[in-house]
């Protein structure tokens, strides 16, 4: 998909206005530099030259200059708000995407130039489109969108791609394709956009219209093309507007997003009340078809979700919310001992108390559950137990349940002296195959370390149908001592995706890589960003940055000043958003904010909204997943202890650390905090109760573990208002356990402490 903004050359549009606030609040400390693979000065000069040629009506010459820049630098990045203050947080697209915006803008800037451009590219676009429609080749359709967006066939390709996305249940992709056909679905509520919230989805702006008078005031703006066209849309599309917007409403209905569907349906009824056509297998009034479909959707059965817990946070979208609630009344039905890890030499832990865990007992293990078997990665080995009784999964003679042994003793992995980061053990199961990073947890060696004697970390892939036999091509090892895998990969089809780090003498480089599962062969590897990290080459670093996968798009929180969306099929960066970083200062509490304890913090995605809590920023913020545009940031200043993004219930984002928080998913407002806040000063008392471990959302309830109790919150509705109330408490001490990570599968609740794995019967 082509990413967001229409980019008029060099007079590049500002990113969403609220991104200025995001950066203003985070510039009180020095901001370490983030380096990207940006386009060079020669290409930037050529882009300026193309604009001047266009102004002089030298159409063909201007077009050829831009096409030439794409040929030489199409994969490199360009800031869409070039020339603005650095504190405003640049937003980046590839040069190829930028060029599509330039060509699309010709429809308004120089219509004759658009005619000439289409004479050049339409024959190829037509050939690709006819072949794609005949064979169902979506790759060709995507090439039209990527490379020939402003051709006469760009809108037709988007229409068909959206249909394919709808068929597959990829509602985010379908919506974004159709929104690019016309500008109105991305417009604002005023002709000049001054009163619109740039980047915020249109339906969220429609929520402001609560009366006929309010609608009447904005109807002229809604009926006209938005001034300035802040979003990339097809120039001069001849497709029927009502039909396209009816499809957008259909997506909301199919997604069961009732609030958005009702707002968009009202918009459709007011702007196109009498339009008719074929939709959802019926012919007639678009409005009547959708009204009937929306009414019937209330009785649709929910799709049964998998009961497995296949990776960190349950799913690769990092937002699992099991349907079954929890009620344990007994002592554990079984337990197993776990490898014990501490943070006694971890530099951040020496400055300030850890968040939601203890220095002497790290909650390092994050098990997965697959086909009634529990798998645990202890870094030196992987173990498997039967969910029902805790017995070894395959070899009864081995009471430890070990299914893979790295051959590296725990003592060999212990770091001598101080270091950054702590050990985390994650796994991913996909189609009865298990993947994990084992061996050394260190991702960046100190400059003093001897790489020839230090053990390395590597990826294993185990065939669970063959009792843990290594898959062909595994283990996967990094290219050398300067390279490291970040953590457990995510899997899609025959492709394995994983974050990688490379260290030189100056900075650390964050990459995304794709390997073929059947051979272990590297398919592609793309540089995301380069930046200084806390160790600065003086201390070893342990990092564990996980990817988020949603319908063919990878989202990567680098914790190094950049968030990126990368297309899984080919490794193309679709957008990259930066934010000002904070510098960790060892030995100084004021330079060691609680947010630095965020380590297992992948992006959480829910219905097209990407929530991010980077470790090098005190902010929690949300981006639109399709475009990277900033939707909101949490501004209370109270949430820098958030280390776990637990999921979404209704329109509430639930997150936790030492406290438990509820935030408005669409605005970022802090709705509730439990318990009440205490002074955040280092010398102040910690909250009571205090979070201990990662909770979960199940059956619409929030389960928050503390040392002695699991607190259960339920959303109570009264007088058209909803509020989260403490519903009950599950006492842990009488059961002989303390708090820790929670996960659930069928009739078992697992609780993971620093040194034991407990299983309870979920009654």
Give each language-model segment a name.
Residues 17-68, 72-105:
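N-terminal leader/linker segments that initiate helical-solenoid repeat arrays
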Residues 89, 93-124, 238, 252-331, ...:
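Long amphipathic alpha-helical scaffold segments
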Residues 386-389, 464-467, 516-519, 567-570, ...:
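Short loop/turn segments that connect beta-strands within beta-propeller blades
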């Amino acid at each position: 998909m082509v990413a967001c903004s229409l980019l008029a050359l060099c007079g590049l549009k500002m990113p969403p206005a609220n991104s200025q606030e995001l950066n203003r609040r985070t510039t009180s400390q020095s901001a370490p530099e983030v380096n990207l693979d940006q386009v060079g000065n020669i290409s930037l000069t050529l882009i300026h030259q193309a604009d001047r040629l266009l102004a002089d009506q030298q159409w063909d010459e201007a077009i050829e200059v831009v096409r030439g820049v794409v040929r030489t630098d199409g994969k490199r990045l360009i800031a869409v708000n070039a020339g603005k203050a650095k504190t405003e947080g640049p937003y980046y697209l590839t040069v190829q995407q930028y060029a599509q915006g330039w060509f699309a803008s010709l429809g308004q800037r120089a219509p004759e130039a658009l005619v000439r451009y289409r004479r050049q590219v339409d024959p190829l676009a037509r050939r690709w489109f006819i072949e794609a429609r005949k064979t169902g080749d979506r790759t060709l359709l995507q090439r039209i969108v990527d490379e020939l967006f402003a051709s006469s066939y760009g809108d037709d390709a988007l229409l068909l791609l959206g249909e394919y996305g709808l068929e597959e249940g990829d509602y985010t992709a379908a919506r974004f394709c159709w929104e690019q056909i016309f500008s109105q679905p991305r417009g604002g509520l005023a002709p000049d956009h001054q009163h619109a919230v740039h980047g915020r989805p249109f339906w969220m702006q429609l929520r402001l219209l609560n009366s006929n008078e309010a609608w009447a005031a904005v109807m002229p703006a809604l009926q006209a093309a938005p001034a300035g066209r802040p979003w990339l849309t097809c120039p001069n599309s001849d497709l029927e507007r009502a039909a396209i917007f009816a499809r957008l409403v259909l997506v909301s209905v199919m997604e069961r997003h009732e609030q958005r569907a009702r707002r968009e349906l009202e918009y459709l009824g007011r702007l196109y009340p009498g339009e008719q056509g074929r939709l959802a297998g019926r012919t007639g009034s678009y409005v009547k078809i959708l009204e009937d479909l929306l009414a019937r959707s209330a009785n649709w059965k929910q799709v049964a979700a998998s009961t497995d817990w296949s990776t960190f946070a349950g799913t690769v979208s990092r937002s699992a919310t099991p349907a079954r609630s929890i009620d344990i009344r007994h002592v554990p039905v079984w337990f197993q001992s776990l490898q014990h890890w501490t943070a006694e030499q971890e530099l951040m832990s020496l400055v300030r108390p850890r968040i939601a865990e203890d220095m002497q007992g790290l909650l390092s293990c994050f098990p997965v559950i697959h086909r009634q078997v529990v798998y645990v990665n202890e870094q030196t080995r992987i173990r498997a137990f039967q969910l029902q009784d805790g017995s070894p999964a395959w070899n009864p003679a081995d009471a430890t349940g070990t299914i893979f042994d790295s051959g590296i003793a725990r003592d060999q992995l212990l770091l001598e002296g101080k270091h950054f980061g702590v050990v985390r053990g994650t796994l991913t199961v996909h189609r009865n195959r298990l993947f994990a990073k084992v061996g050394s947890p260190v991702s960046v060696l100190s400059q003093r370390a001897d790489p020839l004697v230090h053990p390395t970390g590597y990826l294993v892939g185990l065939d669970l149908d063959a009792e843990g036999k290594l898959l062909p091509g595994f283990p996967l090892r990094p290219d050398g001592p300067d390279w490291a895998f970040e953590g457990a990969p995510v899997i899609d089809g025959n492709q394995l995706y994983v974050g990688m780090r490379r260290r030189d003498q100056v900075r650390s480089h964050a990459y995304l890589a794709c390997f073929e599962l059947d051979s272990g062969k590297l398919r592609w590897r793309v540089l995301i960003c380069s930046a200084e990290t806390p160790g600065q080459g003086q201390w070893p670093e342990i990092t564990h940055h996980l990817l988020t996968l949603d319908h063919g798009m990878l989202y990567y929180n680098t914790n190094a000043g950049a968030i990126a969306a990368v297309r899984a099929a080919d490794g193309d960066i679709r957008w990259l958003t930066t934010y000002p970083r904070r510098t960790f200062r060892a030995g100084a509490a004021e330079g060691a904010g609680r947010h630095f304890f965020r380590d297992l913090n992948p992006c959480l995605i829910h219905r097209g909204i990407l929530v991010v809590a980077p470790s090098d920023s005190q902010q929690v913020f949300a981006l639109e997943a399709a475009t990277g545009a900033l939707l909101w940031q949490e501004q209370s200043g109270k949430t820098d202890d958030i280390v776990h993004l637990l999921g979404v219930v209704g329109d509430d984002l639930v997150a936790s650390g030492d406290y438990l928080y509820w935030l408005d998913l669409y605005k970022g407002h802090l709705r509730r905090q439990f318990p009440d806040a205490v002074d955040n000063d280092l010398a102040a008392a910690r909250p009571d109760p205090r979070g201990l471990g990662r909770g979960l959302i199940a059956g619409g309830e929030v389960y928050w573990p503390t040392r002695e109790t699991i607190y259960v919150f339920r959303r109570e509705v009264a007088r058209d208002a909803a509020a989260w109330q403490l519903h009950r408490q599950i006492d842990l001490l009488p059961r002989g356990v303390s708090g820790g990570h929670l996960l659930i599968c069928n009739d078992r609740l697992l609780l993971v402490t620093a040194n034991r794995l407990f299983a309870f019967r979920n009654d």
